[in-house]
C-alpha cells in the first residue's frame, strides 16, 4: 500500500514537471496570458488611490452636480498675478497640507524655507512677489485662522494697493481649503484647547468690525481653558468649535454676522449652510483629510502642479485615541449638525470630482492610444504600398529583359 502511494506521488510530480515544460515551450517569456494572471490579480492591480484611504470600491453619488461643478482645472498663472489663497480651518489637517504647499511642490522657483523660521518665501519666477497666501508663506496677514468672510474682504486690499488694483484688474484669487470629519475635528479641537490653545488672537471681522463680548461671549474666565473636560467643552453654548466648518466657509454678512437677534435660529442655520455649500462648490479646490491621496490627485489636476512626494494617510491622531461612548458621539453630532450635513455634501462632491477626473484621464489615455494605433496602421499601409510598388517595378523590369 505504501509502495503504491509513493508511485502515485511520483506520477503527480512527473506530471507537474511535464506541464511546466510544456507551458514554457508553448508560451515562453512573460507575454503568456497564463503567466500574467498574477500581475492582473486584484491585489496587484489595486487602485493606489483607493488602497491608500480605503474608499469603498463602489461609490454611489447622492447629489446631482453639473459637469461644470465636477471639472476643476484652473489656468493658474504663477508667473503672472494669480494668487492661491488657503483658508485654514482649525484641526482639519491644514498644517500638514500647508507644509506640502511650501515644501513639496515641483516649481521652477521653489519656496525658500529656512530652519527656525515659520514662514517660507514663495516668489514667482523672476519676481519678488508671492503666488501663495497662507500661514506658511505670508503668515496670518488677515488674522489668525481668518474665515471666508474675512479673507474675501481682506486679501485683495492686503495684496494690492489701490493703485495696483487699477493697474492689475485681471488678478485671480483661487481659494482652497481642507475639511475633516466633524466628530474627529471636534475632538481634536477639544484636545488642543485642553492643552492650552485659545486662538484669542482671531479677529472674527465681519462687516468691518469684530464682534462684541455680548455677541461672542467667552467659554472661560481665565487666560485659557486648559484642563477642560469634554463635558465642559460640549456644555458651552458659545463654543466656536460647534459647526466651525460651516461658520468659517459661509458669508456671515448674510445673517448679520455674530448678532443672533437678526433672524430666527432655524432661518440663520439654513442660510449659513446654503452659503457654505455654495462657497465650497465654487472654490478652486478643496480636499478632505480622510482622503490624502485623492486630495493630492485633485490638487495636481486642478492647478497642473505636481507634488514631489506622495501624501501619507495618517489614521492615528489625538482625536482617534479618544474613546467615547455612543451617547457622547450622538451629542457631538447634534452640536455639529450643520457640519455633519456640510461634510456629507463635501464628501459626495469630492468623490464625484475624483471619479470624473479619473474618467477624463482614462478617456484621454484611450484617445491617445487610438491615435497611435491609427498612425501605426497608416505607416504599415504606406510600407505595404511601397513594397507592392517595388515588386511591380521589378517585375516590369524583368519583362523588359526577357524581351
UniProtKB/Swiss-Prot annotation:
Coarse class of the protein's main subcellular location: membrane
Source superkingdom: Eukaryota
Enzyme Commission number(s): 2.8.2.-
Keywords from the UniProt entry: Glycoprotein, Membrane, Signal-anchor, Transferase, Transmembrane, Transmembrane helix
Region (Disordered): 381-403
Lumenal topological segments: 29-403
Protein name: Heparan-sulfate 6-O-sulfotransferase 2
Phylogenetic classification of the source organism: Eukaryota, Metazoa, Chordata, Craniata, Vertebrata
Amino acid at each position: 500500500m505504501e509502495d503504491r502511494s509513493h508511485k502515485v506521488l511520483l506520477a503527480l510530480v512527473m506530471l507537474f514537471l511535464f506541464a511546466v515544460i510544456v507551458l514554457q515551450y508553448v508560451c515562453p517569456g512573460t507575454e503568456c496570458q497564463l503567466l500574467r494572471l498574477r500581475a492582473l490579480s486584484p491585489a496587484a492591480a489595486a487602485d493606489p488611490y483607493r488602497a491608500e484611504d480605503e474608499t469603498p470600491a463602489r461609490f454611489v453619488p447622492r447629489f446631482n452636480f453639473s459637469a461644470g461643478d465636477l471639472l476643476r482645472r484652473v489656468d493658474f498663472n504663477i508667473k503672472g498675478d494669480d494668487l492661491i489663497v488657503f483658508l485654514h480651518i482649525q484641526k482639519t489637517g491644514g498644517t500638514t497640507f500647508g507644509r506640502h504647499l511650501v515644501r513639496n511642490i515641483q516649481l521652477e522657483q521653489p519656496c525658500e524655507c529656512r530652519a527656525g523660521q515659520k514662514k517660507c518665501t514663495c516668489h514667482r519666477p523672476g519676481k519678488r512677489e508671492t503666488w501663495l497666501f497662507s500661514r506658511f508663506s505670508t503668515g496670518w496677514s488677515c488674522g489668525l485662522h481668518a474665515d471666508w468672510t474675512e479673507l474675501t474682504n481682506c486679501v485683495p486690499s492686503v495684496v494690492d494697493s489701490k493703485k495696483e488694483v487699477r493697474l492689475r484688474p485681471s488678478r485671480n484669487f483661487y481659494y482652497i481649503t481642507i475639511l475633516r470629519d466633524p466628530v474627529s475635528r471636534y475632538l481634536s479641537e477639544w484636545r488642543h484647547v485642553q492643552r492650552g490653545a485659545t486662538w484669542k488672537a482671531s479677529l472674527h471681522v465681519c462687516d468691518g468690525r469684530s464682534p462684541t463680548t455680548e455677541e461672542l461671549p467667552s467659554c472661560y474666565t481665565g487666560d485659557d481653558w486648559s484642563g477642560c473636560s469634554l463635558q465642559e467643552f460640549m456644555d458651552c453654548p458659545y463654543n466656536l468649535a460647534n459647526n466651525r466648518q460651516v461658520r468659517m466657509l459661509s458669508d456671515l454678512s448674510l445673517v448679520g454676522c455674530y448678532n443672533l437677534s437678526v433672524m430666527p435660529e432655524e432661518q440663520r442655520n439654513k442660510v449659513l449652510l446654503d452659503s457654505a455649500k455654495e462657497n465650497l462648490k465654487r472654490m478652486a479646490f478643496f480636499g478632505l483629510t480622510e482622503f490624502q491621496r485623492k486630495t493630492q490627485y485633485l490638487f495636481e489636476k486642478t492647478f497642473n502642479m505636481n507634488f514631489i512626494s506622495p501624501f501619507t494617510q495618517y489614521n492615528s491622531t489625538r482625536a482617534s485615541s479618544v474613546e467615547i461612548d455612543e451617547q457622547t458621539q450622538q451629542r457631538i453630532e447634534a452640536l455639529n449638525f450643520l457640519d455633519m450635513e456640510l461634510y456629507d455634501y463635501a464628501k459626495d462632491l469630492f468623490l464625484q470630482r475624483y471619479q470624473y477626473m479619473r474618467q477624463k484621464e482614462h478617456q484621454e489615455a484611450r484617445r491617445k492610444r487610438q491615435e497611435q494605433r491609427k498612425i501605426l496602421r497608416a505607416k504599415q499601409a504606406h510600407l505595404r504600398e511601397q513594397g507592392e510598388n517595388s515588386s511591380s517595378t521589378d517585375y516590369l523590369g524583368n519583362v523588359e529583359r526577357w524581351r
